[in-house]
């Protein structure tokens, strides 16, 4: 009887020994049945801004000990475009306000890439009327981001100046 009871318990416990061993590890949850989930770079960022006018660092021109200024900005990522909003006070210049919507972008599981070239957007940056030619950059899933804004001030005049803004930042 004891032997039969042992066999019965073994027979009942046998299904517990067979476990489904599928590949159910999500990793970083970016691939779902072959569908890649893009990162979400929307949010607020803190970083440093460098402004170059005709290739010279604007901050160093004003003060040789300063090469950049702290800056905060917001990225709003949509399906194929991204909006950039800077509204912050920066060293020497004071208030920097820039709102650009509809910057072409692509996203994958690793990063958001801004690839706005040949934009021709007229804005006022740091007191100069400029034409923004391009906004490019990348924001990674770790929250690190880099932006490059290329513009021309006083375009079409003998005093035309090239304005380049470089920002490196981290998501808050």
What are these regions (language model features)?
Residues 2-4, 14-48, 156-172:
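Bacterial Sec-dependent N-terminal signal peptides
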Residues 42, 46, 68-70, 100, ...:
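Surface-exposed or flexible loop/turn and strand-edge residues in extracellular/cell-surface modules
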Residues 63-135, 139:
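Predominantly extracellular/secreted and cell-surface proteins with exposed
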Residues 98-111, 144-172:
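Edge beta-strand at a domain terminus
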Residues 45, 86, 113-115, 143-150:
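A short hydrophobic beta-strand element
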Residues 40, 44-65:
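Transition segment at domain starts
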Residues 50-54, 89-94, 119, 154-156:
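Hydrophobic lipid-interacting interfaces of membrane-associated proteins
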């Amino acid at each position: 009887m004891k032997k039969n009871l042992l066999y019965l318990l073994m027979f009942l416990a046998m299904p517990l020994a067979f476990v489904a061993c599928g590949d159910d590890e999500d990793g970083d949850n970016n691939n779902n049945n072959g569908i890649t989930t893009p990162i979400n770079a929307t949010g607020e960022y803190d970083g440093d801004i460098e402004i170059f006018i005709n290739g010279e660092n604007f901050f160093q021109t004003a003060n040789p000990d300063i090469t950049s200024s702290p800056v905060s900005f917001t990225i709003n990522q949509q399906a194929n475009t991204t909006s950039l909003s800077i509204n912050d006070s920066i060293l020497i210049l004071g208030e920097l306000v820039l709102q650009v919507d509809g910057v072409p972008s692509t996203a994958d599981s690793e990063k958001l890439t801004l690839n706005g070239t040949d934009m021709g957007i007229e804005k006022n940056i740091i007191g100069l009327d400029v034409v923004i030619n391009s906004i490019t950059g990348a924001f990674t899933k770790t929250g690190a981001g880099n932006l490059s804004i290329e513009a021309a001030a006083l375009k079409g005049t003998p005093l035309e100046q090239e304005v380049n803004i470089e920002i490196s930042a981290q998501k808050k």
